[in-house]
Amino acid sequence: MAEITASLVKELRERTGAGMMDCKKALTEANGDIELAIENMRKSGAIKAAKKAGNVAADGVIKTKINGNVAFILEVNCQTDFVAKDAGFQAFADKVLDAAVAGKITDVEVLKAQFEEERVALVAKIGENINIRRVASLEGDVLGSYQHGARIGVLVAAKGADEELVKQLAMHVAASKPEFVKPEDVSADVVEKEYQVQLDIAMQSGKPKEIAEKMVEGRMKKFTGEVSLTGQPFVMEPSKSVGQLLKEHNADVTGFIRFEVGEGIEKVETDFAAEVAAMSKQS
């Protein structure tokens, strides 16, 4: 039996919003596997969804740049919004992006090594930790990018589309957060995991398994549509799907990348009272 630590319970509470005892029970039943605990809590109805894990938990900027038939996107993190707007921090991020584009670098460790000296100097000057977090590139016939402030950046690659359409698609991706291009692109493990969750929920309604399975088939079609770009309602004209929009223009999306500042990073919250108490004991 895995040890159920306080930190593990705290993480599950933050990710689900459930009570401490419910989290501890779920972790015990899942033998300490937090992902399995979340699945079980969804199935039991203890939570409706486990989406808090994607909450923004760090600051910084997203930068994008298109160079011919290749586009790059970069995330550089700092600790506060104040520093994220600092001219020196912005210039550092721009310099890192330019280096990635010039050298066609998509390995973040290469960029970290190349800019470590400058990063350390900037940390000393600004007084906050700075991290070159991730970089990616996208190739395509027609490329478009969109930035929502400095916190969300999107790249889209398409065929048969003009620049205006690709820009609109990038804006859609920024707003609607699709995970795949088409419903058929949704990976088998994601489909299977969601299918089992939905089947358990349907079975709990007391319906026969055959009817429950038919109910789940409809839900799965809706699910794969919701998480895919072409299956989503187009944000600028919700009466049609993105797939219908592309068909009207005889165009196709070949790929996209969406970065949001701090997604997936847990922000450390300082307990001021505990910190003061600890300092008192040391003195």
Swiss-Prot record:
Which Gene3D superfamilies would you find in this protein's record?
1.10.286.20, DNA helicase RuvA subunit, C-terminal domain, Elongation factor Ts, dimerisation domain
Described by its record, this protein's role is as follows: Associates with the EF-Tu.GDP complex and induces the exchange of GDP to GTP. It remains bound to the aminoacyl-tRNA.EF-Tu.GTP complex up to the GTP hydrolysis stage on the ribosome.
Q: List the disulfide bonds.
A: none
| Region feature Involved in Mg(2+) ion dislocation from EF-Tu, mapped onto this chain | 80-83
Q: Which domain of life is it from?
A: Bacteria
Question: What family is this protein classified in?
Answer: Belongs to the EF-Ts family.
Q: Which GO terms describe its cellular component?
A: cytoplasm
**Annotated SUPFAM superfamilies:** Elongation factor Ts (EF-Ts), dimerisation domain (SSF54713), UBA-like (SSF46934)
Recorded protein name is: Elongation factor Ts
Q: Which Pfam families match?
A: EF_TS
Q: Where can this protein be found?
A: Cytoplasm
Native source species: Salmonella agona (strain SL483)
> What InterPro entries does the record point to?
EF-Ts_dimer_sf (IPR036402), Transl_elong_EFTs/EF1B (IPR001816), Transl_elong_EFTs/EF1B_dimer (IPR014039), Transl_elong_Ts_CS (IPR018101), UBA-like_sf (IPR009060)
The root-end lineage is:
Bacteria, Pseudomonadati, Pseudomonadota, Gammaproteobacteria, Enterobacterales
